[in-house]
Amino acid sequence: MRKLRVEEMGRLTVEEFKDAEKFPFVVVLDNIRSLANIGSFFRTADAFRAQKIILCGYTQSPPHREITRSAIGAELSVAWEKNERPVDAVMQLKADGYQVWCVEQAEGSVMLQNFQPQYEKPCAFVFGNEVEGVADEVIAAADGCLEIGSHGHGTRESLRRQPSLARRVRTPARSVAAHRAMYVRLTK
């Protein structure tokens, strides 16, 4: 057994990725302050072929050296846009037919393992500030909140941001029954 070389992995070029069909989800970043976290979101969005990332509030945007350091080139392939007000981004997504879910601990939140999205509608996942979380007005405008269980006493919210995106999108992306048509098109 040996590790594959990069050229053996069949990865898309930046141009091919931009033209490739994407999975029907968007990532919304609500005032993320860490540039390394922003870059990590770009890498995760690239890995799961997100439609785009919406950078809201004071969330910094590429090009930026610290974002590039953790994005490792994904900031060049993933579409992104800037919106100063996170709630405006959420309202526009809802008007465009998206179901919007905040990744946050809130009253009535759905545990991640129990989440059943409406597969006929695209999803938007909102991730909040590392300290304050998702803004209350954004939670009020969303369709609901997803909660990721934590078992440690001192678990930091920021620690769970990028892994939660990967966990959230992995299930529908791997569900052949729910995404059969897209799966077939993406693997041709």
Where are these regions (language model features)?
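Post-transcriptional modification and biogenesis factors for structured RNAs
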Residues: 1-188
